[in-house]
């Protein structure tokens, strides 16, 4: 039995879970998320818990059991609290600003990067070097934050680039020079 899959998902107040023909819809104060599940698992709602159980003991069902339970848990947390990732921009002249639904980033190239902010994602710039990406869907928030990070990956010699707030960059020692 999947150790993650057998734990029921707790549903907080204000969040409603609906299951209909393989599609689970979770609605809360921050928004609505839905996900289609394969018929190898069954999802049922009991009072303030959602229980994910597998239909048989096939390899596919065992693989999907914990996955679908965690996806459902992320949906419940997303519509009740939301998810966010913080990016830190390091480098001389590197900065970011939001103009409407566009994020403009100066990252040391001759032209600035303009990135369209997708729907369902909110971007705040606390200081010109700190960008907070937030939203309801954990997958979409992480995907957009990774897309921004790829614009200028942190380099190991000076540490310049875009990194996650929790990330530490292992610095390399440069050339020692002639003695």
UniProtKB/Swiss-Prot annotation:
GO molecular function terms noted in the UniProt entry: rRNA binding; structural constituent of ribosome
Pfam families the UniProt entry points to: Ribosomal_L6
GO BP annotations listed: cytoplasmic translation
Any one annotated GO CC term: ribosome
Protein origin, superkingdom: Bacteria
Record's keyword terms, sorted: Ribonucleoprotein, Ribosomal protein, RNA-binding, rRNA-binding
Assembly and binders: Part of the 50S ribosomal subunit.
Xref: PANTHER family: 60S/50S RIBOSOMAL PROTEIN L6/L9 (PTHR11655), LARGE RIBOSOMAL SUBUNIT PROTEIN UL6M (PTHR11655:SF14)
Function: This protein binds to the 23S rRNA, and is important in its secondary structure. It is located near the subunit interface in the base of the L7/L12 stalk, and near the tRNA binding site of the peptidyltransferase center.
Family: Belongs to the universal ribosomal protein uL6 family.
Protein name from the UniProt record: Large ribosomal subunit protein uL6
Organism: Treponema pallidum (strain Nichols)
